[in-house]
């Protein structure tokens, strides 16, 4: 997980850039716990009183990339790095569990994005940025292989529960498969089979597993 330090306000949730960076870096545990406590005290009002013990554990595991209970090997078969795939999926799982403890789950938002890593080979970096109370907390990334044949990026068994994918439009590329113009097919925008530029509410993506591969 990488923290979005560049361009971040001087303070975020009453924490300095350096504090946030240390929290998700390989710092000493006592320093990490002290910083985490400050984060928790700032955020605890967002969670129901009877859920705060659970929320505390989930938030700690989330910011420290702890492994969850989900079997990551079942998803994102096109991932280049298995360890990054596990971190990516577990971060999503923990964040969604954290939302169930919140008084207003809409204040915890995950936004997806994609960018071309190498035009020649078609690899794409998929990223999800996590926000709490509109503050950017961190970004998790996953690099994906080119799909089978001429089919853009490999999104077989993609796992994006609760992620807002509306910013995933990559533009009209010239890549084609057979006689079809791929950007005119459903899935070009990672919008789950709807037409390009359609706006999706976040609820549409809850617990969704994508099975198509077309996303050039």
UniProtKB/Swiss-Prot annotation:
It comes from the Bacteria. May be missing up to 80 C-terminal residues compared to orthologs. This is Protein YabP. It comes from Escherichia coli (strain K12).
